[in-house]
């Protein structure tokens, strides 16, 4: 990112969600002080079917979406959820104050999903 520029970006918007953790990008941005904006914090929808995520949500009395957003915040990401439904937008705000344990955060980070983030260095433009 910085090999052609001397200006460090303030924000890097990348696909980050439970099960879609781009460790190299996360580490690099944290090292450079770049805020990570988590585009697609709910993944491709399969996150809502994951038993482990449902169990964490039930334990906290929250929805899977709220848990995904709480995980993003716990990882110091800025999640960017998309919705046009007022009730879902309001529900998303209930993610604040959810305290996930380190074990729960690790489960969410490493959960197996099939629809990961595309790697730019592997794309054929």
What are the residue ranges of the model-derived segments?
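Beta/alpha (TIM)-barrel catalytic core signal, keyed to glycine-rich beta->alpha loops juxtaposed to Asp/Glu
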Residues: 1-125
